[in-house]
Amino acid sequence: MPSFLRGILKPKERHHENKNHSQVSSDSLTSSYPTSPPKLEKTEAGSMVSSTTQKKTSHHAKPTITTKTEQSQRRPKIIDQVRRVESLGEQVSQKQRHMLDSLINKVYTGPLGEELVQTLYLRIWAMKETPESMKILQMREDIRDQYLRMKTERWLRTLIRGKKTKLRDFQKRYEEVHPYLMMERVEQIIMEEAWKLAAHIVQE
């Protein structure tokens, strides 16, 4: 039984119990409940107990069916919300989504991607050393380039999302992540380069 129905049904159950106790003889009452149920005679009191139990059972079943129906109606909406959150960048307008996918493809395959990883490498090399920067600089070149491309894609999909991303949307998102970027200088550099690449999409 759903937890929110317990508080509603308990007063009714107590009312039926008091009513039943008042209609049975005083000899059948004991100081404690028996381990086995007492045999009921074929009296009006016995028939009243039986009918009351049936009413209780039918009363319990109705809210349960209603609750399951409501949950089944809500379930598709909840699933839709989860799917939207799972993949950043999928909520953009069709035009922005096409431009974003095209840009990410160039980051991985075209000369734009080569220029990007070289710029990121030089900026990370010139910055003050941190554990993250040292880890990147010590990577093998092909692994490092792929790592920087993946980081850039993540920032692109983070910055370009919503029904239609505008400049003020980016500014708001930047303010949200600013404290994190102040502690992670490498992430700040990658985010800045990602923004340079995506600025034309936002300003369209």
Curated annotation (Swiss-Prot):
Renumbered residue ranges of the record's region Disordered: 1-78
Q: Where is the composition biased (Low complexity)?
A: 25-34
What broad taxonomic lineage does this protein's source fall under?
Answer: Viruses, Riboviria, Orthornavirae, Negarnaviricota, Haploviricotina
**Pfam families per the UniProt record, alphabetical:** Paramyxo_C
Highest taxon, organism lineage: Viruses
Organism, by scientific name, is: Human parainfluenza 1 virus (strain C39)
* Family from the record: Belongs to the respirovirus protein C family.
- What biological-process GO terms show up in the record? symbiont-mediated suppression of host innate immune response; symbiont-mediated suppression of host JAK-STAT cascade via inhibition of STAT1 activity; symbiont-mediated suppression of host JAK-STAT cascade via inhibition of STAT2 activity; symbiont-mediated suppression of host type I interferon-mediated signaling pathway
Under which name does UniProt file this protein? Protein C
Q: Where is the signal peptide?
A: none
Per the record, where are the segments of Basic and acidic residues compositional bias? 10-20
Q: Which UniProt keywords apply?
A: Host-virus interaction, Inhibition of host innate immune response by virus, Inhibition of host interferon signaling pathway by virus, Inhibition of host STAT1 by virus, Inhibition of host STAT2 by virus, Interferon antiviral system evasion, Viral immunoevasion
